């Protein structure tokens, strides 16, 4: 299965590429911006998008929800430094296709989140669960 990396930080992309390369049956592809993401999802929407929402060119929760409706087989792993509680609540309440992982989480939690998303299950990291 293909994992799309939608993160502007080179070091984060390099780390994710490395971690995912060690996981069987998965491959990564980097998307540079929203236009590139849309083109790639049109080719194959049955994928996982690891998205740093705070650094990518998606404006708000509404826009992300529209993308979720447009590509219903895509799983979204929001992987960011800081996400507002209200933002996360909106997404979690709207669709089971959204998962949440903070960049401060452990490597074990990162791998678990990716496995959950690949299996079409929702994942919310422990830290975010405590806040919600």
Where would I find each of the regions flagged by the language model?
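Conserved acidic segment of CheY-like receiver
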Residues: 1-11, 16
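Conserved active-site segment of CheY-like receiver
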Residues: 8, 79-83, 103-105
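Short hydrophobic/Thr-rich beta-strand motif most characteristic of the beta2 strand and flanking loop
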Residues: 25-33
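Acidic, metal-coordinating helix/loop segments flanking the phosphotransfer/catalytic sites
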Residues: 32-48
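Conserved phosphotransfer cores of two-component systems
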Residues: 42-44, 67-73
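Conserved phosphotransfer microenvironments
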Residues: 48-67, 80-87
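Two-component signal transduction core modules
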Residues: 49, 76, 99-101
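Short, flexible helix-to-coil linker/hinge segments that flank and couple to helix-turn-helix
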Residues: 88-92, 97-132
């Amino acid at each position: 299965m293909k994992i799309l990396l939608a993160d502007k930080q080179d070091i984060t992309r390099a780390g994710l590429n490395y971690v995912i390369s060690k996981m069987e049956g998965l491959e990564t592809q980097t998307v540079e911006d929203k236009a590139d993401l849309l083109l790639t999802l049109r080719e194959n929407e049955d994928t996982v998008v690891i998205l740093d929402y705070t650094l990518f060119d998606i404006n708000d929760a509404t826009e992300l929800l529209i993308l979720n409706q447009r590509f219903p087989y895509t799983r979204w792993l929001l992987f960011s430094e800081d996400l507002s509680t209200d933002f996360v609540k909106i997404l979690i309440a709207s669709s089971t296709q959204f998962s949440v992982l903070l960049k401060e989480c452990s490597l074990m939690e990162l791998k678990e989140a990716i496995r959950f998303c690949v299996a079409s299950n929702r994942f919310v990291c422990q830290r975010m669960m405590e806040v919600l």
